[in-house]
Amino acid sequence: GWKKFKELSGVLCGKRWSLKLKGRVYRVCVRTVMVYGGETWVMRKEEEGVLRRAERAMVRMMSGVKLRDRKSSGELMSMAGLCEDIVLVVRRSRLRWYGHVLRKTENDGIREVLEVVVPGKVGRGRPKLGWQEEVRKDMERVGLRVGDAKDRGRWRGGAFELPS
């Protein structure tokens, strides 16, 4: 994300355009790069924090406001038109992709990969949260069930109701 931001810093950090327009350019060009492949991520709190901090820093640089100016990040984000949390964007894309996979046929390759069980010994301690558990938590937050994936409208509507 930072690489793309620095490529566009002439536009994003310049004083020529409004913060609202810079926010649109950021959302289309930089944020999409930052969340690319997010459908497959299992995000811990640390990774969520890294994404949020990076976005806040970029918006602060776009606005030209320093910390000593005492403007909150929330104010700057809303001024730039970035009211949606970046972690929420990743969760939505993960749910959208999971619905796409569930609509595939049973013998499709991606369905087989999704339902594979790796043989072998399980290590000691609590296992790390897996991708499917993360998706199940997201589904519970919006009240979706696996069977709802066949109804695209219901699934997509549920994914967009995802609370932060």
Language-model segments: residues:
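Short linear motifs embedded in intrinsically disordered, charge-biased segments
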Residues: 1-164
